Structures are given as structure tokens and as C-alpha cells.
């Protein structure tokens, strides 16, 4: 062999190796692996619910802490509580990813699920701002589920169902981001909303934000119990032998689904030098920033007054839009995305989705000119299409990220992506809120007005489209096409 061929470590089959066992199961299994997909769905939902459940009541929670000297300061403190989770996750995602690559996916999933039970419950029992922000930060530090479950989803099913398994992660996460606010909105302050059921002297009267946290923690407990039967996918008990192999053979083996024939390679080059991986992570971060900024802006825009270009929706109206779009998202991901990805390819789906989102977002300000049934019909259709395109982007990037690295580095690779994404997402909500407020204050300004051609917040959606355009351009980085 040539001198530049790298020294690698080879793993031979072992009857007791959990990774080898799952590989044999994949080879023997026929049909859709519903059991494995169910595990993936449950864990993905568990990681999404705590993130979004506090948004409907965080304003009132901060108000009841009496830390804000005036009402205008409540949003300032609420922003710190919201961002503390992402900061904690950004600090520890790489650490958890490396542990998952060393000790396996299952123990890390169990730790992450258990942390939801503990810290999410404590958050609902918080009686001060500093306790709430500390518990939220710790929840982010131990919430290692999303990155690990993405790596797990790509390994537990055969190559044929890879797109389906990762689309289940995206769909469950999307549903969780819709169910979370519903749980928080309906169950917070139950003694005030449902006095016939909950008295002011009960624990739910003394801790008005405990019930939504308790419901999510009970669900997390059920997931923790179910995960005891979760099969491990990491090759942890194979015999190690030194050998030489051309690095291209590793990529060829992984592209065939990561299964073991006679030997399995473990090679750990620096992930930071993996240019296709770094390119995918950069694109993922840009689209994640745009997505979370849109989520923040959409809620503010929908409930704002029509004089500011909003829809004058109630919280119930917004909830209905989110619920309908969530149902449409579920149908799209399970029935439409897998055959679409197979027919046109991953990169084509990502680029097509990014292109179509730009004219769609450009239409949003003009939807505010509608009213009545027409308004509700159009905004629901637009929301379904927007979520379907966004999830197509995310799912495609998930798959390409896992294809960019061998199995024994997928945990660390997803940890790096989670760290970078969490950093970007920590700026998204605050940036989106500032942008929205700035645009509303400049409705009639002569320079960079909030409205341009119509009494709508066009400037807000213009900025969102600029971020979307940057992400689209970045998909043409040459290294990304190498993953196909």
C-alpha cells in the first residue's frame, strides 16, 4: 500500500456486540421497523416538550417573581430564562456526543430523559427568578437527547429506511414544539382557570406553573421506562486489531448503511478537519437561526393589532393554526418526504425547499390584508407549506450530517452541530423580538420603514428572507455535494 494510507483500527464481528446484533437484525428484518421508529418518536418528543412549554406562561411567571421593577422589564428577564436552556445545551453537547461514541447511545438517552424528569419538575416549582434560570440552565446542560437520537435514528434502521427514521425525529420534534405551548397554555395557573377542579390552597394553587411541568415529567417517566428496552447500536464489544485500509473504503462501507461484513472500521480523524461536515453544520446553523426567529416573529405578528400589520389573532386562533400545521406536517413527513427524497435526492430537496420558502415568506405580510374565512384558510395553508418546507430542510441536513462521518463519530458530530445550533438559536428569539419591535416603531419612517408597499411588517419578513437566501447560497459549497 502507499505510504499516505492511514493506519486504522479494525473491528471484527462479535456475537455479544450490541452493534453487531442490531446490524444482523437490520439484515434479517423485512418491512418498516415500526418498533424502532416508535422509540425514536417517543424520545424526540420528550426532548421537544420542555423547550417550548414555558412560552405561553413565562410572562406571568416572571411577573409573579416580582423581580421586574416595571412591566416593560418583564420581557427582558423572560429572555434570560428562555436563552439559559440553549446556553446550557451549547456548553455540553460535544461532551455528551463524545460519551455517546464511547459508552453507547442508550445510556446517554437514559441520562437525558431522567434529567427532564428532575429539572423540568423543579422548574415548575420555582419560586424565584434565579432558581428558575438555574434549573433551566441545568436542564439544557443535561438535555443531550436530540443530538444522540439523531445519530441513533441513522443506525437502528437499514439504509432503505434512513430518510424515514430521521424524518420521524424532525416530525416528532415539530409536533413537540406545537404540543408544548398547548400544554403550557391550557394547564398553567389551573386554580384560576379551573377553580372547580383546583383550589387556591392546593399545591397547584400555591405553584401555579407546576401542572404543565408535572404532565411533561410524567410523560418523560414513561419514556424512561420504555427506553430500558431500547436496543444499543454502537459497536462496543468487538475485537480490536491493527491494520491498514484506504480511507475511501470507510466511506464506501458507511454509504452502504454502516453494516458489518467481516470487519468494521473505527477511524477517528479530527472532525474539525472534516470539511463536508463543517459545511453542513454551517448551513444547518443558518437555517436554524432563521427558523427560530420565524417562530418568535410569527407568534408576535399573529397577535399584534392590524394597525401594525398584524392579524389581530387571539391565543386560541394561533393555537389552531399551529395544531393544523402540525397535523399537516405529520402527514407530509410520513407519506410525502421519503419518496420525494428518493426520487430527487437529498441536496435537491434541501435547495428546492430553501428556494420555495423565499416567495412564500414574501407573501406573509400581504396575508394581513385578508379577513374572515379567507384569512384563516390562507394562513393555515401557508403555515402548513412553510412547516413542510422547513422540516424538509432540517431532515435533509440531518441525513447528510450523519453520512459525512463514520458511525463511531456520529455522536460527537451531532454534539458539535448541537453546540453550534444552540449558540445560533440563543440569538434567534431575542433578535426576532427586537427586529419585530423595531419594525413596528418605524411603520412610517422614511428610512428602512417597517412597511413599504402596504400596511404590513414587510421589513421583518424581508430580513428573514435575507437569512434564508444566505443559507441557500451556502448549500452550493462544493464540499456539501461530496456527501451525496
From Swiss-Prot:
GO cellular component term of the entry, any: membrane
Keyword set includes Transit peptide: no
GO MF term set: transmembrane transporter activity
Record field: transmembrane: 39-59, 76-96, 107-127, 129-149, 168-188, 210-230, 278-298, 318-338, 355-375, 381-401, 416-436, 460-480
Domain of life of the native organism: Eukaryota
Name the record gives this protein: Probable peptide/nitrate transporter At3g43790
The UniProt record lists the keyword Hydrolase: no
Pfam family, one: MFS_1
InterPro entries in the cross-refs: MFS (IPR011701), MFS_dom (IPR020846), MFS_trans_sf (IPR036259)
Membrane topology annotation: Multi-pass membrane protein
Species for this entry: Arabidopsis thaliana
Effect of gene knockout: No visible phenotype.
Keywords: Membrane, Transmembrane, Transmembrane helix, Transport
Entry's localization field: Membrane
Family per record: Belongs to the major facilitator superfamily.
UniProt record, GO biological process: response to nematode
Amino acid at each position: 500500500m502507499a505510504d499516505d494510507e492511514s493506519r486504522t483500527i479494525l473491528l471484527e464481528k462479535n456475537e455479544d456486540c450490541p452493534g453487531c446484533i442490531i446490524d444482523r437484525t437490520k439484515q434479517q428484518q423485512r418491512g418498516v421497523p415500526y418498533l424502532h421508529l416508535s422509540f425514536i418518536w417517543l424520545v424526540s418528543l420528550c426532548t421537544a416538550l420542555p423547550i417550548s412549554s414555558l412560552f405561553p406562561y413565562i410572562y406571568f411567571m416572571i411577573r409573579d417573581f416580582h423581580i421586574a421593577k416595571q412591566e416593560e422589564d418583564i420581557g427582558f428577564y423572560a429572555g434570560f430564562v428562555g436563552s439559559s436552556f440553549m446556553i446550557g445545551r451549547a456548553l455540553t453537547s460535544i461532551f455528551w456526543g463524545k460519551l455517546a461514541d464511547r459508552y453507547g447511545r442508550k445510556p446517554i438517552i437514559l441520562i437525558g430523559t431522567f434529567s427532564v424528569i428532575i429539572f423540568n419538575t423543579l422548574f415548575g416549582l420555582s419560586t424565584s427568578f434565579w432558581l428558575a434560570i438555574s434549573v433551566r440552565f441545568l436542564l439544557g446542560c443535561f438535555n443531550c437527547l436530540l443530538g444522540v437520537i439523531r445519530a441513533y435514528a441513522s443506525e437502528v434502521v437499514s439504509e432503505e429506511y434512513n430518510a424515514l427514521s430521521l424524518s420521524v425525529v424532525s416530525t416528532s420534534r415539530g409536533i413537540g414544539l406545537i404540543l408544548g405551548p398547548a400544554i403550557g397554555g391550557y394547564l398553567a395557573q389551573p386554580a384560576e382557570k379551573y377553580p372547580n377542579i383546583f383550589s387556591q390552597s392546593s399545591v397547584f394553587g400555591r405553584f401555579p406553573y407546576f401542572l404543565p411541568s408535572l404532565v411533561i415529567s410524567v410523560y418523560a417517566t414513561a419514556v424512561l421506562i420504555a427506553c430500558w428496552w431500547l436496543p444499543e447500536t454502537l459497536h462496543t464489544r468487538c475485537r480490536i486489531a491493527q491494520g491498514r485500509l484506504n480511507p475511501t473504503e470507510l466511506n464506501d462501507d458507511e454509504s452502504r448503511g454502516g453494516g458489518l461484513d467481516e470487519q468494521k472500521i473505527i477511524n477517528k480523524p479530527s472532525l474539525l478537519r472534516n470539511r463536508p461536515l463543517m459545511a453542513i453544520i454551517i448551513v444547518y446553523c443558518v437555517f436554524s437561526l432563521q427558523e427560530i426567529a420565524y417562530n418568535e416573529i410569527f407568534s408576535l405578528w399573529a397577535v399584534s393589532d392590524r394597525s401594525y400589520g398584524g392579524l389581530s389573532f387571539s391565543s386560541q386562533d394561533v393555537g389552531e393554526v399551529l395544531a393544523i400545521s402540525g397535523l399537516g406536517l405529520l402527514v407530509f413527513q410520513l407519506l410525502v418526504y421519503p419518496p420525494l427524497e428518493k426520487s430527487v435526492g437529498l441536496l435537491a430537496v434541501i435547495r428546492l425547499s430553501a428556494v420555495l420558502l423565499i416567495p412564500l415568506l414574501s407573501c406573509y405580510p400581504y396575508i394581513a390584508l385578508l379577513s374572515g374565512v379567507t384569512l384563516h384558510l390562507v394562513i393555515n395553508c401557508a403555515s402548513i407549506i412553510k412547516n413542510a418546507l422547513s422540516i424538509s430542510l432540517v431532515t435533509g441536513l440531518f441525513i447528510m450530517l450523519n453520512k459525512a462521518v463514520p458511525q463511531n463519530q456520529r455522536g460527537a458530530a451531532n454534539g458539535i452541530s448541537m453546540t453550534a445550533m444552540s449558540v445560533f438559536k440563543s440569538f434567534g428569539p431575542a433578535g426576532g423580538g427586537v427586529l419585530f419591535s423595531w419594525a413596528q416603531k418605524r411603520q412610517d419612517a422614511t428610512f428602512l420603514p417597517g412597511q413599504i408597499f402596504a400596511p404590513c411588517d414587510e421589513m421583518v419578513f424581508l430580513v428573514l428572507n435575507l437569512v434564508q437566501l444566505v443559507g441557500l447560497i451556502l448549500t452550493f459549497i462544493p464540499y456539501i455535494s461530496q456527501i451525496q
